[in-house]
Amino acid sequence: ECSVVFLAAGAGQYLRSTLLKRGVSHMATWMACGFLAAGLYIAVVNVLVAAGWVSPNHMIGFISSVLFLVPGFPMVTGMLDISRMDFLAGISRLTYVGLLLISASFAVWLLGSLFHLPLATPAPLTLDPTLDLLLQVLSSGVAAAGFAMLFAASPVACVWGGVIAAVANPARIHMVEAGMPAHMAATIAVFGVGILAEIVAPLHQRKYTRISLSVPAVVTMVPGVLFYRSMSHFASGDMYSAATG
């Protein structure tokens, strides 16, 4: 699933950069990229299933192929604007975020409905706890560094964003697995991200702002899969599943 998601999301990101360079509307771009990424995931997995190499239950990962379309930077900065009482900037950014998420969600819902794809939560992996932790650290760091690159951050800021996420995000996951409410775990983890960013920034004479260091790490905690799944349930009229994720 991760390999196919890598291929599908890479193709979607290439299309997004191409369309944005040509001045195409952001909403149309997000929708087209959602169709390409999710559609490519579905096509590749179907080919693998037809060849007998994988089982059909791997189709459940198709939503992960569009996570790169979560506009994390404007989402986080919009909420920061609201917290500073800058409602004009905050509402503008969050409205932009909402429109893009709806555009991408339409692609997820339509493809999921056409191909009758599962929207259930995947079964947890049965891995050695040490290996599981190492994979969480690695994937969190790579994801945050990748998001920082999408935000046009400098290489040093990308590396530090990955390091901060590699510490904070696995800690959040383990707090949730230990029984802590997800929102409380996220609050503690995000607070930790801010503290780490404040520690790192002076190391480079504050050449890199706390925002550029912390936002990529925070974006890895955005529940994109839950959002897209809920929007798909909502579009299908299943309000209970939409509300519960």
Question: What role is predicted for each listed range?
Answer:
Residues 1-222, 229-245:
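Alpha-helical transmembrane segments and their membrane-interface boundaries
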